[in-house]
């Protein structure tokens, strides 16, 4: 029913969402939020923050997107997904009011608006101590940006994605993401590009919000295998943090940066006495954090890894991780890759990154397939883009058949 109702799109803006939440009793006003935006790393940062807060004894709601297997994954309280009954009940209730708002002339709702409203109402019912809220697209005009006073704002790595909606330069995209920054609320950002930093810093100044630049952190890696072990030090003139032997289960150097960003967000809340958490709880939370589908090792005999990279920046990080693991746990292993993507993504850049990355690790075979979506890029077209004298490429349109072949 959600798909049927959201087949048409209304005008861009928050007025429709605000009206719907008003009819629902403004559930967002009764919740405490951590707001997370960015192009890549949002989901992992959300899980790192949530895991640290849980380790300190807090009940934590997490709203993220997209899901890997089912809608329920997007609505998480203390690692328990919303039940089918609760999801259907609340979403149906939300849609009844959405129809009223549409009739009032506000326009049609998007799927994300319905799901965000469902999440806010669900979290109000369940009353977690803190909700980690991940944006969908952008920040300023994102449907999660109806919240007024988060505990802290976080902006992860920024790259080129949704350029038709956010802009075709990093500065324009950064400006859209920086729209989540609120008056007087600290913002942590890990983007190292100067043009991105300048935009976020300028918006923070306008909003009297402290800007904490996570890219200033220096780290060294002690172990890079089925887990990451690292030392890090952060100093920006006013804040200082130093921790050795930090261990995380999310794999890849980019996950170290995500972990540091999350830790600085938690530290910001602690320093302002919004939460009570010590270093041992932070360490425990970082170690126990999980994020489905982010270079996730499902099995190790043989190794089966899934990764949901959906843009060039994310895929590049996955290829860098694969290259590092080729030197350790994947040494002397055959590498067979199953790959599919959407036709409305930057698939040409992604296929070039994939080809280069797989060549670098002497991959044995690539099986290209099609996601179950009308947006899927045809496997035969993908095969032509990927074909290389160094790698065997096979096209199998059905996902399950492709995986069975691998």
At which residue positions do the language-model features occur?
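N-terminal leader/targeting and accessory segments in enzymes
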Residues: 1-40, 44-59, 69, 127, ...
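Active-site-proximal loop->helix
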Residues: 66, 70-90, 164-180, 201-202, ...
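Beta-strand->loop->alpha-helix junctions that form or flank phosphate-binding loops
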Residues: 63, 190-191, 203-225, 248-253, ...
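Acidic, Mg2+-coordinating active-site environments of NTP-dependent enzymes
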Residues: 101-102, 126-134, 150-245, 259-280
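C-terminal helical cap/extension that packs against the catalytic core
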Residues: 193-203, 208, 212, 303-306, ...
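ATP-dependent carboxylate-amine ligase catalytic core
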Residues: 14, 21-29, 55-148, 164-166, ...
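Nucleotide phosphate-binding/pyrophosphate-handling subdomain across enzymes
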Residues: 130-135, 141-154, 158-159, 172, ...
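Hydrophobic alpha-helical packing residues
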Residues: 49-54, 123, 269, 386
């Amino acid at each position: 029913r959600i798909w049927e109702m959201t087949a048409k799109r209304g005008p861009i803006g928050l007025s429709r969402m605000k009206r719907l939440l008003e009819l629902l009793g403004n559930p967002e006003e009764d919740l405490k939020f951590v707001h997370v935006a960015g192009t890549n790393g949002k989901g992992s940062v959300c899980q790192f923050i949530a895991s640290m807060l849980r380790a300190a004894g807090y009940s934590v709601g997490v709203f993220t997107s997209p899901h890997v297997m089912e809608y329920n994954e997007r609505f998480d309280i203390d690692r328990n997904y919303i039940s089918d009954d609760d999801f259907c009940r609340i979403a149906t209730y939300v849609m009844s009011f959405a129809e009223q708002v549409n009739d009032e002339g506000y326009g049609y709702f998007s799927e994300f608006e319905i799901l965000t409203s469902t999440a806010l109402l669900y979290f109000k019912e369940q009353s977690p101590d803190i909700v980690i809220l991940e944006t969908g697209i952008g920040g300023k005009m994102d449907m999660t940006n109806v919240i007024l006073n988060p505990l802290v704002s976080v902006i992860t790595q920024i790259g080129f994605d949704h350029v038709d909606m956010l802009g075709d330069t990093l500065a324009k995209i950064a400006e859209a993401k920086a729209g989540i920054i609120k008056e007087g609320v600290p913002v942590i950002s890990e983007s190292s590009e100067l043009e991105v930093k300048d935009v976020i810093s300028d918006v923070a100044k306008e909003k009297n919000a402290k800007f904490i630049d996570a890219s200033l952190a220096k780290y060294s890696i002690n172990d890079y295998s089925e887990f990451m072990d690292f030392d890090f030090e952060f100093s920006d003139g006013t804040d200082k943090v130093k921790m050795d032997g930090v261990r995380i289960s999310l794999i890849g150097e980019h996950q170290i940066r995500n972990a540091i960003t999350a830790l600085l967000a938690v530290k910001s809340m602690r320093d302002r006495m919004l939460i009570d958490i010590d270093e041992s709880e932070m360490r425990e939370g970082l170690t126990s954090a999980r994020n489905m589908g982010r270079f996730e090792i499902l099995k190790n005999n043989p190794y089966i890894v899934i990764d949901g990279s959906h843009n060039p920046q994310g895929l590049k990080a996955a290829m860098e991780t694969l290259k590092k693991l080729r030197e350790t746990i994947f040494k002397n292993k055959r590498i067979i890759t199953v790959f599919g993507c959407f036709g409305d993504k930057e698939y040409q850049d992604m296929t070039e990154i994939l080809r280069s990355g797989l060549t670098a690790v002497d991959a044995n075979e690539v099986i290209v397939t099609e996601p179950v979506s009308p947006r899927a890029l045809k496997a035969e077209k993908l095969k032509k883009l990927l074909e290389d004298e160094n790698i065997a490429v096979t096209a199998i349109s059905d996902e399950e058949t492709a995986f069975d072949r691998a």
